[in-house]
Amino acid sequence: MTLFQAFILGAVQGLTEFLPVSSSGHLVIFQHIFAIEEPPLTFDVLVHLGTLIAVFVAFWDDIWGILKKPFCRLTYLLIVGCIPAGLAGFLLAPYFEKAFESLLVVGIALIFTGILLSLSENLSKKHFGLKEADETGFSDAIFIGILQALAIIPGLSRSGSTIAAGLIAGLDREFAARFSFLLSIPVIIGAAIFELSDVFVTGIAANNILPYILGPLTAAIFGFFAIKVVLGLVRRGKLSYFSYYCWIVAAITLFWYNLG
């Protein structure tokens, strides 16, 4: 892997991990349309850890608050919200492997992501969500968690689904986004742990270590930038802007699928 490839892959992962456009969906699209090979597993794990650093930097105040008061309501909400994704990853992941080979699945899922983003914005403007952590119920956390679990389908954005679910549930706009990003921490850590055994097998070539440093660093920087962009758009009620992007990419994806 070259340094340029590492930079591009890190940037794409950092941006699409947090922008509501589906990182897994874009990976499938790039592999099919641009014939880009899937990166080595070790690189993939390290890049995901780079995005984890971005979350820690962006939300350190929230994380530090949880560490100081681990039994606060936000902690319990995050635990409850992670349960559906944990069950889905453990029980259903093998059944979704073929979805990562299908442009049709990605195209349809991107259409659904766009609809979800647009719908949530319209609903949130009608009921003016004001729920902060203390007012958010465990049923709200489960609902958000279920949407996160469904994002195992490539093309269905994890960040988009969880933010949209929070808005639909009546959460305060900024808290909905913060909760979504904090909810990504256990998911990213869990995915990294799940792949660690294979990482020890593949390893890193001693003469090719620089790309494995540049990739995660790039992912962290672009991931932090993406988080700030999403937070700003959510505050201003402009999340639905990404709906149009998802629909355009979905149209291109389905067109390419029909050509095949």
From Swiss-Prot:
The disulfide bridges present are: none
One Gene Ontology cellular component: plasma membrane
Gene Ontology MF terms in the entry? undecaprenyl-diphosphatase activity
Q: Where are the transmembrane segments?
A: 40-60, 76-96, 99-119, 181-201, 213-233, 239-259
Write down the membrane topology.
Answer: Multi-pass membrane protein
User: Which EC class is the enzyme in?
Assistant: hydrolase
Q: Which family does it belong to?
A: Belongs to the UppP family.
Task: Add the further remark from the entry.
Answer: Bacitracin is thought to be involved in the inhibition of peptidoglycan synthesis by sequestering undecaprenyl diphosphate, thereby reducing the pool of lipid carrier available.
Q: What is this protein's record name?
A: Undecaprenyl-diphosphatase
Q: Which organism is it from?
A: Syntrophomonas wolfei subsp. wolfei (strain DSM 2245B / Goettingen)
